[in-house]
Amino acid sequence: MKAIIVGGGIAGLASALALTRRGWQVQVLERAPEFAEAGAGLSLWPNALRALDALGAGQPVCARAVPAGQAGIRDAAGRWLSRDDTTELARRFGLAVMIHRADLLAVLATAVPQEALRSGVTVTGVRPDGTVLHSAGESRADLVVGADGVHSVTRRSVWPDAPAPRYAGYTSWRVVTPPVPVGETSESWGRGERFGYVPLPDGRIYCYATANTPEGAPGGGLAELRRRFAGWHDPIPALLDAADPGAVLHHDLYELPPLRTYISGNVALAGDAAHAMTPNLGQGACQALEDAVVLGDVTAAGNGLAAYDQRRRGRTQMITRRSRRIGAVGQWASPAAVTLRNTALRLLPSSALTRALAPVLDWAA
């Protein structure tokens, strides 16, 4: 049986690995000239690590990762609004780790047969019968996995009437800085702006920020980050001072409205192509890894793609909704609303977070 994977990101490589382990002949088509990722930091929650274990990649990924430390939410002045009970989270759900996105991709790419990886190939169309049109010609497969991101060519080809990605209302910046002492990990919430930082395994710091802006507004790079956040609490000014202007990544944030199905004929969608979500729960990559495991399971069991759709669509769309709601509250800009939000966070027990995360993290391969 032959499978073509459209897209060589996390969803694509994980799907290729899952299918290869089930005996499929796999080909991954990636439009970039090489299978690499500039990217930044990435959180892998316990559900993702269970998925990686099921793919046989858990150990090499954890060898390149660092366990998530104490964390919480602050205001722009540095006052704690809430702290995560990471000990209880780990006891209840398992370990969470931080890794550089490029390191995760490297592990996945190494685990897939190298002859299966075809870079520099741009897919221009996909048909439900398993035909893939691309810059190198035309290919046919028993299964096509559209893992080509939020603006998926696969989705637009097979589901031309599917809803377009929806702008979340805020934009994002990401940058990895040289090592800077940061103490506890935190995400700080202001008025329509947020800034977070997390140590990576090599001592560098992954920083991310969001701000309410019109869709398509210029990002402004490091200068804009400094303008917005240089007056926030330590160590944010030091992190911005240490950042390389050329390393700042800027992207508007989108989510995909719920699709009626993730499958059609011999085609299945995975990752952001199926359920692009805002990053507020840190679940985008985690859900892509779950997709891959389930895809491998249902094809091995001979249950057909309907079982994949049944197992994945409701769960991923639930997580997309939860992530949207968290982001909406985090991006509140009205002074009265921000005061109310911050007061509520201070009063909320850490056990409430554990309960809220249970439907997301309680997943078994």
State what each model feature region is.
Residues 24, 57, 234:
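Short phosphate-binding/catalytic loops that engage adenosine nucleotides
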Residues 346-365:
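C-terminal auxiliary extensions adjacent to catalytic cores
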Residues 32-34, 41, 65:
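Residues in the short beta-alpha loop(s) of Rossmann-like NAD(P)-binding domains
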Residues 82-105, 137-139, 178-249:
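Conserved FAD/dinucleotide-binding core of flavoprotein oxidoreductases
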Residues 152, 172-174, 193-196, 274-275:
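Histidine-centered metal-chelating micro-motifs
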Residues 8-33, 145-146, 173, 245-334:
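Conserved mid-domain beta->alpha element of the FAD-binding
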